[in-house]
Regions:
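Alpha-helical solenoid repeat scaffolds of the TPR/TPR-like class and their adjacent stem/linker regions
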Residues: 1-513, 518-580
Length: 580
């Protein structure tokens, strides 16, 4: 029985391993592999139960480590902390590994300084552990680019010095040798060379590429590009290296070489991440041929959307009939349009509904529940005077009967919508007439939690907006729904009145100008044809166009302001508001 368990586990057939193990849970080895297989299959509650049973039967440090891992996977962090600290008191052969797990737990829970202390102590005891150094350097990788860069530079300096010491014979590995003959000396020299090569490979393929990316995130673009360029020969088979290099080239407006770098990454690993990064580049360019190629790659986003996608089966069915018959496949059919991405994408791509309404017999549109009332009311208003959406029905729940289903963001692909056609299509949201306010009302929105720790930073501080609006004869109205902030009595807080997107729409009806970050409310404001200033950080999303010349192809009237320096940006924003 155990041989079967071992066989299936080490051949990565965790389902079969779990199935066999669960028939013999009285055997401690079977129980161990049942727990490990459950972890591999992300059946976390089952993994925790088995880990607890293991620890009851055999309270070793190893089983304690397994239990702590199960606690972490089930977000039981306090239990994990308590267990790991208890295990440390044993001071046994797994002392280092328990510390590593504790450091990982500190990282997960945001206690990065505590994690840093553990790694520093471990490195004092074992300064030549390459993987330990890598983990240490990566502590702040997503949270503090300056600290992360400093750690990478510390690592590089240490290992460069180590290499020099080995070359000079000042540092010699312990080598078992009974004689001092020529053959042994030759073998020792060969081992030294292998060690040097190993260190250099570690730096050139694992550490320096990360340093180059950190330089990019800190906007030290020339340094980043120079370092990436110098590392190419060592990373010919490293797909992630080429993906990150492509991002820096793209930001530097070197779009052709960025395209080649993304293609290089794809040639090494045909992963969805590389495909939709390439899609973003192509769609950012704003030319018809690039947009057409980008649409195809953009479909790869659904690889990561299985949990949000209504049905992979129905999407694949739609793709198959489209590949066979093209757009004609949807003529006189009942088509379900579902939404698998954010609110902003739903609003932005909703103008593409007009095209499918021209082709299909009936369109069943199922927006996110928070948007249902808004779209239902808007379609009702529009259908009183227009025919564009007469065959469209807004649904609160997903239907059981339809011919084909497709995501709203896939409409440009399935409906063969050209780039120049997009802005001509009508958004199913009725535009507001310009308000007649004696004192202009300025709406503001500056923060979204979705932008925290994301690849593209979008948020600004409230004070930045207030500085730009200071001493201006306008009434400021906040639409900020989330975040830790305090508004002065001079600012009206309309967020208190908002429960869904229909409320948001209604509360925008008297706004003269909306100042917002890249967010869903930006798209809604633009759909309502409210003069809208979209504030962007230097690295921004593809939908706002080229880095050196931002322009929205979905919203041509958007006033886009890229803020590179906040003091200068506040001055530019102040001037831009006065023109609206």
């Amino acid at each position: 029985m155990l041989n079967q368990v071992y066989y299936y586990y080490f051949n990565s057939n965790y389902e079969k391993c779990l199935e066999i193990s669960e028939k013999h849970l009285d055997n401690i080895d079977a129980l161990t592999y049942a727990m490990l297989s459950s972890l591999k299959l992300s059946i976390n509650d089952k993994a925790l139960y088995y880990a607890q049973q293991l620890f009851i039967k055999n309270a070793t440090s190893f089983d304690g480590l397994l239990l702590s891992k199960a606690y972490i996977f089930n977000s039981k962090f306090q239990e994990a902390f308590a267990l790991l600290k208890k295990l440390l008191t044993k001071n046994d052969s797994l002392y280092k590994e328990i510390n590593l797990e504790l450091a990982l737990l500190f990282q997960i829970t945001g206690k990065l300084e505590e994690a840093e202390k553990i790694f520093q102590n471990l490195l004092k005891k074992d300064p030549y552990d390459l993987n330990l150094w890598k983990s240490y350097a990566e502590i702040y990788f997503k949270k503090d680019y300056n600290k992360a860069l400093k750690a990478h530079e510390e690592l590089c300096a240490f290992w460069s010095q180590t290499n020099e010491k080995i070359k000079q014979g000042l540092l010699v590995e312990k080598i078992q040798s009974n004689t001092s003959n020529f053959q042994d000396r030759l073998q020792n020299k060969r081992k030294e060379n292998i060690t040097i090569i190993k260190i250099e490979e570690f730096l050139n393929t694992r550490i320096l590429p990360q340093k180059a990316y950190l330089l990019f995130k800190l906007f030290k673009i020339e340094q980043s590009l120079t370092l990436f360029y110098s590392l190419q020969e060592f990373n010919q088979h490293n797909a992630q290296f080429w993906q990150n290099y492509a991002k820096v080239l793209e930001f530097n407006s070197n779009y052709q070489n960025a395209y080649h770098a993304y293609q290089k990454a794809l040639s090494l690993h045909s992963h969805a991440t590389y495909k939709f990064d390439l899609a973003y580049l192509l769609m950012r360019m704003g030319t018809e041929d690039n947009f057409e190629e980008g649409k195809k790659f953009y479909e790869s986003r659904l690889f990561y959307a299985h949990n949000e996608t209504f049905s992979v089966y129905h999407y694949n069915k739609t793709m198959q009939i489209f590949n066979k018959n093209g757009i004609d496949a949807f003529k006189n059919k009942e088509i379900l349009i579902f939404c698998e991405q954010g609110f902003g994408d739903t609003i932005m791509y909703s103008r593409c509904l007009e095209k499918i309404c021209q082709i299909a017999q009936k369109v069943l549109f199922a927006p996110q529940s928070a948007m249902y009332e808004m779209f239902k009311n808007q379609i009702k208003f529009l259908n009183q005077s227009e025919k564009n959406f007469r065959n469209l029905k807004v649904l609160k729940t997903l239907p059981k009967k339809f011919d084909y289903a497709m995501p709203i963001c896939s409409l440009p692909f399935f409906m063969d919508i050209k780039l120049t056609e997009i802005s001509q299509l009508k958004t199913p949201i009725k535009a507001y007439k310009k308000p007649q306010n004696k004192i202009k009302k300025i709406g503001i929105f500056w923060f979204t939690p979705n932008a925290i720790d994301s690849e593209t930073t979008r948020n600004f501080e409230l004070n930045f907006l207030l500085d730009a609006l200071k001493d201006m004869p306008y009434k400021i109205i906040s639409f900020q729904m989330q975040g830790d902030y305090t508004l002065s009595d001079k600012i009206e807080n309309r967020a208190k009145k908002i429960k869904n997107w229909n409320d948001t729409l209604n509360n925008l009806n008297d706004i003269d100008c909306m100042i917002t970050i890249d967010s869903a409310i930006a798209h809604l404001s633009l759909a309502l044809e409210i003069p809208t200033i979209v504030l962007l950080k230097p690295i921004f999303d593809w939908r706002w166009g080229k880095f050196e010349q931002p322009k929205s192809f979905f919203w041509p009237k958007a006033k886009i302001l890229v803020i590179k320096d906040e003091k200068d940006g506040a001055t530019k924003l102040n001037k831009l508001i006065k023109t609206i």
